[in-house]
Swiss-Prot record:
Cellular localization per UniProt: Nucleus
CC per GO annotation: nucleus
Induction: Negatively regulated by microRNAs miR156b and miR156h.
Region feature (Disordered): 49-73, 437-475
Pfam family, one: SBP
Biased composition (Polar residues): 465-475
PROSITE patterns from the UniProt entry: ZF_SBP
Binding site for Zn(2+) 2: 221, 224, 228, 240
GO molecular function: DNA binding; zinc ion binding
Main localization of the protein described in the UniProt heading: nucleus
Name of this protein: Squamosa promoter-binding-like protein 12
Zinc as UniProt keyword: yes
């Protein structure tokens, strides 16, 4: 039973004792006592007017009683005025009985009760009546098992039986000592490593080549941490075959071929399986194109094409791939057929169903010609100066050169291809200018006759090396 009262008086102050909740003052004896009320089912508000001629003061009392199964709380307030009429108003509040809520799983009576009318309730003796924990409840905490809330120490020490059972199970599991599951092994694993405790195998039997577990010959796999039969185990390794196969499959995964355009090799198929062209980038100003395959088509007939070279070009050496001969012709005069410009090299050159694509990278709009290396690989170079704009005399001279399938046409070759009847292979002939002496044709390997003075072409040296690159500068 805890009770307290407050007294408001206009003339004298009110003194409050925290240890003893009974107020003391000049009007202490005039305070009405709190009357306990029976437990109603609702909130009861009672107001009464009392006539008083000489009453000046107000009282406020409240009482709260906590028991095992019920909660009683009453609030009494009395306000008096010093007027002549002497009206006195008194309020009495009684809280509804709080029903207990089950807090434990075993069905024991536990309750959580709330009384919103009383300002504060003391949980235990010796604590202040009014709690200082703002915003938090200072009552009915840690209630379990139907204990009396008046003793906070007893309430805090009691726990639910379900929690006790769980703690007991954990303690039993920790106290149980695990042993090795190999037959005949009674090694206590309580002080062993966590790995061996978890898999219930001692360190000696985890590495043994053969153990008996449940009457069967087994061996412990240190990779998958399981016992396997001897047939499933690799005797040379410490892992089972399935684990090893998965490991090898991950290590031997086929890796995709990396294609780089620096100074590496890019292999692409331009024809079929019998023809393959390897392209190298970054090794020359415009790259080198080398054909490694020779067509094996048997009888294509005489495939002829007409070449027309500009006047500043000089006869070049024959490119000697196997069964591949093509030469360029220095011919003055008008161009017989249309000239192929640098942007036409991106097209496809047909060779009886097989196509090859000549790559053009940064070719100078003026000209790009083909010069032969010692190994026969054509080299794309840039014309350093193209100063000739003079027109030569009209001349209708054509050069026919036999090209076998699989050869790569020079980039500035003018292809006006016509398929004729099969002819016997002959050496490539180059027509001379009509104005030069000695008329007729000259064979490969002979030095070409000099041109006349009007169209004398002087070869210039390439800045990169000391050999002539096959370009001419006209005077």
């Amino acid at each position: 039973m805890a009770s307290f009262g407050m007294n408001w008086n206009q003339k004298s102050p009110v003194f409050w004792d925290w240890e003893n909740p009974a107020p003391f003052g000049p009007n202490t004896m005039e305070n009405p006592k709190s009357i306990p009320h029976p437990e109603p089912r609702g909130v009861v508000v009672a107001a009464a007017n009392h006539g008083s001629t000489n009453s000046s003061g107000g009282t406020f009392t409240s009482s709260s009683e906590l028991a095992n199964g019920s909660s009683k709380s009453s609030l009494s307030a009395s306000f008096d005025s010093s007027s002549k009429l002497g009206n006195s108003l008194e309020f009495r509040f009684a809280s509804v009985k709080g029903h207990g809520k089950n807090m434990c799983k075993d069905g024991e009576a536990g309750r959580v009760e709330d009384s919103g009318t009383s300002p504060a309730v003391a949980v235990s003796h010796g604590e202040p009546v009014i709690g200082l924990k703002l915003g938090k409840r200072t009552y009915f905490e840690n209630v379990c098992g139907g204990q009396n809330v008046k003793s906070s120490s007893a309430a805090s020490g009691v726990t639910c039986p379900s929690t006790v059972v769980k703690k007991m199970k954990v303690s039993q599991q920790s106290t149980q000592s695990s042993y090795c599951q190999v037959e005949g092994c009674k090694v206590d694993l309580s002080s062993a490593r966590e790995y061996h405790r978890k898999h219930k195998v001692c360190e000696a039997h985890s590495k043994a080549p053969k153990v008996i577990v449940s009457g069967l010959e087994r061996r412990f796999c240190q990779q998958c941490s399981r016992f396997h039969g001897l047939a499933e185990f690799d005797q040379k390794k410490k892992s089972c075959r399935r684990r090893l196969s998965d490991h090898n499959a991950r290590r031997r995964k086929p890796q995709q071929e990396a294609i780089s355009f620096g100074s590496s090799r890019l292999a692409t198929m331009f024809y079929d399986a019998r023809q393959q062209t390897d392209i190298y980038f970054g090794q020359s100003p415009f790259g080198q194109v080398r054909s490694n395959a020779i067509s094996s088509c048997d009888n294509l007939g005489g495939f002829k094409f007409t070449e027309a070279k500009l006047p500043w070009m000089k006869p070049m050496k024959t490119i000697g791939l196997e069964d591949l001969n093509f030469s360029t012709l220095q011919m003055p005069g008008n161009v017989v057929s249309h000239t192929v410009h640098h942007h036409d090299f991106d097209g496809l050159i047909p060779f009886k169903g097989n196509t090859t694509k000549v790559l053009n990278q940064g070719v100078d709009p003026a000209c790009a010609v083909v010069s032969s290396n010692s190994n026969g690989a054509p080299d794309l170079r840039r014309a350093l100066s193209l100063l000739s704009s003079d027109s030569w005399g009209p001349a209708d001279v054509q050069a026919g050169s036999q090209v076998h399938p699989g050869g790569v046409m020079p980039p500035l070759a003018v292809a006006a291809a016509t398929v004729t009847a099969p002819t016997n292979p002959v050496s490539v002939m180059h027509a001379l200018h009509p104005s030069t002496g000695g008329g007729g044709f000259w064979q490969d390997g002979d030095d070409p006759p000099p041109l006349d003075h009007a169209s004398q072409a002087q070869a210039f040296m390439h800045p990169g090396n000391g050999s002539s690159s096959g370009y001419g500068h006209l005077h």
